[in-house]
Structure formats: C-alpha cells, structure tokens
C-alpha cells in the first residue's frame, strides 16, 4: 500500500517532530491533540525549528513555507478517517493509548495502519484492543525526531508482513533508518539506555559523585555526546521513570528497579528541562 495521508495523534515534542519530519519528506500531515492549545504549541514549536534551520542556511524560506503548508491541525480525531496511517504519540500510558486505539479503530477505514510511537509498551497488548491487530505496529522514533536517524519498528504477534513492509518503507521515505526489533519491554533502545541512566542516578543517590562529574566521566571516558543525567533531563524524568517501571514489571528482574531518587524527583515535580529543574537547574538559563 502506498501511504500518502498521515495523521499524527499527539502534538508534544515527539508528535510535532514526527509531523515536521513527515511534511519535510513531502507528505501531507494532519496533527491532532486532545488539547487544542497543545496542538497550536506543537505547530509553533516546529515552525520555530524550521525558522532556525533557515537562519543557519540549512534550508531556504521557500522550503520552510512548503513544509509548513503541508501540515494542518485537526480539530477532532474524526479526521483520522482520511489517513492511510495514524502515528500515535501521546503520553507513555497504556490506558490512554489503548483508549485512543479503540477510538481510531472505530473511526479509520480498514486499510489504515495504526502505529504507536511508544518507547517501551507492548505492541501486542495495544493491538489486542482493536479489530485490526494485523494493521497495528510500533514505530518508535528517537528524540529529537528531525535529527535522529533511527526508527525502531516493532511487530505485534498479529502484525502482517505487508504492514511491516509499508511502515519500513515509510520510515525510509522520511529519511530514517528502520531497524526491526521484537516486541519485548523497552525494545532495544530503552532496554539498554534506561538502565544506564538509572545506574547513573544511583551513583548520585549513593553519593558516588555529583551529576556534573558523572556526566563528564561518560562524555570524556566513553565518548558519549551527552552525559546520562543531562540526557535524562532532556528525555524527562517522568518518562524515564515510566520506562523503568515497564522494564521492571515486564521483565521482573531487580536490575530494572527504578532508583528511589528518580521517584523522589518526579514526585517533587523535578522532571528535567521541561519543568526547569531536574539533575540540573534550567531556570537560570532561561531567565
């Protein structure tokens, strides 16, 4: 099946990034969010990113306008009836995702592929709430979407070969490298990355070193472009906690137990860069 019309459901950092990347590849994209203000904020965010690219000479003003003209905001989820694929990019919450997939299954025509940008939740379980499990698949983009080249493609137990091939082809058209992985908690990326971040948090919790020192060790000693604690702040500490909880409950191994300090920060509202404070203080930088 040739995919022409795309809807992105969820206009946060990931959703707006996916919409921008798809439009940049020549697709017409509808972007929806249950909160209309969030949809407008998502559009504003991607416009700002495109303008920044133009200032740096990475694209012309004409190209920027062309990309923006291929993105429209949907006022209702009902507009998904026009889509060949819906890429869900809402909060990492199973109840919210399954509810959305039930709704999309009712709205969308039979040929529409329902893809989830989940970073850790089981695709098979999400697909099971629909009447089209063969058309449900995981399409896990990396953050920031316009920059990062990887897309993890995850088949559920019932995902058809045709659906997988269509999504792999779509990812390639969007300028990404599609890597197929199996449907296990955290897939590959977060099963490897998040325990490392969690261990770095334990190093803070146990007084091994300060966040700056830990990040410096990993950058200079392991050639990481960003330290694990700065990366955790960038991802969002609430998201990190959610993924660690999925790994811990899904795999049952104590090595995936979330650090108590991570829980404490999330309960305090210290979520990282988006809240102004996490392992680093971002409020001073923005004031």
Swiss-Prot record:
Oxidoreductase as UniProt keyword: yes
UniProt-recorded Gene Ontology molecular function terms: 3-hydroxybutyryl-CoA dehydrogenase activity; NAD+ binding; oxidoreductase activity
EC number(s) given by UniProt: 1.1.1.157
Involved pathway(s): Lipid metabolism; butanoate metabolism
Enzyme class, first EC level, given as a word: oxidoreductase
Keywords: Fatty acid metabolism, Lipid metabolism, NADP, Oxidoreductase, Sporulation
Induction note: Subject to catabolite repression.
BP-aspect Gene Ontology terms: butyrate metabolic process; catabolic process; sporulation resulting in formation of a cellular spore
Reactions catalysed, as given in the entry: (3S)-3-hydroxybutanoyl-CoA + NADP(+) = acetoacetyl-CoA + NADPH + H(+)
Record-marked site positions (Important for catalytic activity): 140
Domain of life, per lineage: Bacteria
InterPro entries attached to this UniProt entry: 3-OHacyl-CoA_DH, 3-OHacyl-CoA_DH_CS, 3-OHacyl-CoA_DH_NAD-bd, 3HC_DH_C, 6-PGluconate_DH-like_C_sf, 6PGD_dom2, NAD(P)-bd_dom_sf
NCBIfam families: PRK05808.1 (NF004474)
Family: Belongs to the 3-hydroxyacyl-CoA dehydrogenase family.
UniProt protein name: Probable 3-hydroxybutyryl-CoA dehydrogenase
Gene: mmgB
């Amino acid at each position: 099946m040739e995919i022409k019309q795309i809807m992105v459901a969820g206009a946060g950092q990931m959703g707006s990034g996916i919409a921008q990347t798809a439009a940049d590849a020549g697709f017409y994209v509808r972007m929806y969010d249950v909160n209309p203000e969030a949809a407008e904020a998502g559009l504003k965010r991607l416009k700002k990113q495109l303008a920044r690219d133009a200032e740096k000479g990475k694209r012309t003003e004409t190209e920027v306008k062309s990309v923006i003209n291929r993105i429209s905001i949907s006022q209702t989820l009902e507009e998904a009836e026009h889509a060949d694929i819906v890429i869900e990019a809402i909060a990492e919450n199973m109840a919210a995702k399954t509810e959305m997939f039930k709704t999309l299954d009712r709205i969308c025509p039979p040929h529409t592929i329902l893809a989830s940008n989940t970073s850790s939740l089981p695709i098979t379980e999400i697909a099971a709430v629909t009447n089209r499990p063969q058309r449900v698949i995981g399409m896990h983009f990396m953050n920031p979407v316009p920059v990062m080249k990887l897309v993890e493609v995850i088949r559920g137990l019932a995902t058809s070969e045709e659906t997988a091939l269509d999504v792999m082809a779509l990812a390639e058209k969007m300028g990404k490298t599609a890597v197929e992985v199996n449907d296990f908690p955290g897939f590959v990326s977060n099963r490897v990355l998040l325990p490392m971040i969690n261990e770095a948090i334990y190093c803070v919790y146990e007084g091994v070193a300060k966040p700056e020192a830990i990040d410096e060790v990993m950058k200079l000693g392991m050639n990481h472009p960003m330290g694990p604690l700065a990366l955790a702040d960038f991802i969002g500490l609430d998201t990190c906690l959610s993924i660690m909880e999925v790994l811990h409950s899904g795999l049952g191994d104590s090595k995936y137990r979330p650090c108590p300090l991570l829980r404490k920060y999330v309960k305090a509202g210290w979520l990282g860069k988006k809240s102004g404070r996490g392992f680093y203080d971002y409020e001073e930088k923005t004031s």
